[in-house]
Amino acid sequence: KKKNFTLQIKIRDNSQGRFFTFKNGRVSSKNGVHPGADVTMAFEDAALACHLMKFNRSQLDFISAGKDFSLTVNGPDELCVYVANMLTAITNMSTIFGGNFGTDMGNGVKRYTTGSNGGPMFVYVKDGKILRTTPIDLDSEDPEPFTINARGRKFTPPRRVTCTSHGLTWKSMVYSPDRLLYPMKRVDFDPKGNRNTQNRGISGYERISWDEALDIVSSEIARVKKTHGPGSLFFAGSSHHTWGNIGYHLSASDRFINTLGFSRICMNPDSWEGFYWGGMHHWGNTAKLGSPDQYSTVEDQLKNSEMLVMWSSDPESTSGAYGTYEGAIRREWLKSLDIKIVHIDPFYNHTAAWMGGKWFSPRPGTDTAMALAIAYVWITQDLYDKFFVENRTKGFALWRDYILGKEDGIPKTPEWQEKETGIPAKDVRALAEEWGSKKTYMSPGGMAGVGSACRGANGGEWARSMLCLMAMQGFGKPGVNFGAMQFGTPLNHRFFFPGYAEGGFSGDYNFTGSPVNLYQRMPSTPSVSSITQFVPRLRIPEAFLEGHAMGYPMNPYSLEGQFFPAPYPSPGHSQVKLYYKYGGAYMSTQPESNRYALAYQTDNIEFVVNQSIWNEGEVRFADIILPVCTNFERWDIGEFAHSGGIIDKTFLQCNHRTFFVQHKCIEPLGESRSDFQIYTDICCRLGVGVPYSEGNTEFDWVKRMFDATDLPKVISWRKFLTKGYYILPPIYDEKDRDPVAYNWFYEGRLKDAPELTPLPSEYKEEYRRGLQTQSGLFEFECSSLKRFDPNDPERPVINKYVPSWEGRSSELYQKYPLQLISPHPRYSHHTMSDGKGTVINEISNHRISINGYHYWPVRINPEDAEKRGIKHHDLVEVYNGRGSVICAAVVTQRLNPGTVHAYESAAKYDPTGLPGKSPDRGGLINILTPSRTQIRQSHSMAANSCLVEIRLWKGDQSK
């Protein structure tokens, strides 16, 4: 965009200088110092000026000069950023060569690369439009994959990089009819008059210009800060984002939050709930929120295991975390070895249906009873690893006495659990006997250390029981460990490339993983906010409506970090008055979602802006809507399945380490802009554009990220831009591969896992000696819980069976006799690929078309359906006291009577009447789930403890 201005470049003492006049697309220049330059760039001396203005300058030197003020830039912020962008482009000229990136496929077609939550892909473009997307098939230049030798056979994955069905639907997501293409203002919102907050979610919108939208947003930010003080601004995004280290919310949004001083969201560990609030107290692993290490477990499982127990585990649906279908071939290898496979899940999930084996279907929320009964059999029949229990654990005797009934007079026998779970005692006894006599891997959750069962009312006790069972079997010895072939491949992790959770260009070393490596490799100005207020995500409605809320932090550093209450508002801070919401997912992913609809309509919140790609979910509640482009329409860079941070080395789910530039494949649709550009535009209006952007464009940040990694050692920037990806050779020699997870602990050696955690201060006698607990041992009796609250009945110091407060034994069961479970969906990454008019809607297991409308399926047993007069694909109302959702009934034997199943994360909020007060037909199952936390002293989700009733839907009449 052409601008008219005068730029002065000079030595600070005015001894030398040259100014440049830009006018109507032309530039002229003269020696000397201009008396009225619009932008002045002043250097301490000529030597520094020459050093920093040369081609391919040192970014470290440039940043350092800014930090010590030997380089200053003064002028209007928008012009300063414009000049900095221009000069960066000039001094990095070798990185820019027109449109010569991507691969020419002939006939006017270019092949680009990009990434997604469903995997990386090729993007074929012609005439500025996407033709198709495909998975990345490797070429002859790419290295061979790894081979594992096990039981006289060789196992080698194919030479391709997989992509999920929802990953490959991105073309239809880019061109979705629900795309937001222009800035919008609610028709009855007047920032200088009546704001009509009661009409949020009801009123329509009118198109406005970007200048008007940005002026309103920036002026509201300034007004609210001045009027109400620190803490009055609040920014909230979702757990996930479009792929890429630069555009990801922990990068671009995080720096924006710090630059302007927003209150932050206090996240709950939604994928790990039970392992974080319960499991970690037995063994630490706080950096992974209580979930286990899985280094080299794929090879160990193929070589040594005899049995696999998958408990609340469906990796064929959830892909671990971004792992797409990479683990499917490895589970195929396992099947070919005739290893016994057991599935424990109320729903006969997709992994069970594909892999086969024995299926156990406990009633929701009763899994812990089944686990304790298994422990009872092991104790009474001596089917456990006594060496491990005696030498690597502490407190077993107390737990053993509880199992045997010495504490409460109730032996936890298979017969006892049958009354709770509905599973015959003989079957549980047979399972326990076989498990206790075989070298067995166990996968609690699809990636191990997650799972739907940990997101129930007693999810912490379930997670604890999983760890206690594995401790009884001696985890870490050959063939006994955690995993289901989803994690733990022999890839080379000694090659540095950061995951998105390491913060991108955020410069934030408090709330990202940047301090581990990236802050040393990619120089930037520090990004720290002075605001210390947090709003608990699960209590946002209460914070808005009632003015106060309580949360507990998600702290990866210590066991005790989660014990500190985090009250809202913080001392000396204002209540939230301005809500900057990224995306629309909370209406579907957070429990008792109607609360969020009602919270938007309070006049306690004076201004709401939503920045989103699609018009869905809670976007409709904003005063101003800012349209965002997809990552197909901007530059970025990333690695397949690599999040980093609290899921360290996530790429070990993959069969190839795959790094890719995310080309700007097409121009942004309509007037949509990238998050980075929107944030920069707002910051410029508020005078902090330079601190936010450091004078870089997104392309500049991508190049800086490339330079910060090990990629320049193996591929040139030019070739990387052209080919689009690089495959790192795996570790071919078995002796060079990582030691198997926890083998060091089983054998009593120093920890040899390739990770820096836990922190040195967490070790008790010697660095890398023992676990993170007080004793350094696996603790059946948890010292941390004993110190914190030894008498807490919801979280006792030993693992116990605590019946669900919303289950068959609760009073509510008489009114709502169906137990609803809502695991993560198979065909969408949470809300990201659902709705939007995409091709995913045509998959009948995802949505069902009835009279031209795509309804969310609810699965019900034939016996329950017959009692209610429900037939296959009838429209039904799923309801309880929190609300109701209209779904399409799927009558199936894949769950037992009394249990119903519907995935969470429908993206489309479509109330039939007033928002928050009427049935929804978009499929927002979380309208029905409880907002109560698992235990009171936590900030935890219990969505899978949910009682409902179902009846036929007849429009505005139900029966």
Predicted regions and their residues:
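N-terminal export/assembly segments and adjacent metallocofactor-ligating motifs
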Residues: T95-L383, P424, M466, S506-M522, ...
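N-terminal leader/propeptide and maturation segments of large enzyme subunits in energy/redox metabolism
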Residues: L168-E212, I216, P230, G244, ...
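Feature captures hydrophobic
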Residues: K1-I96
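Short acidic-glycine loop/turn motifs at beta-strand connectors
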Residues: D13, T21-R26, Y124-I130, G881
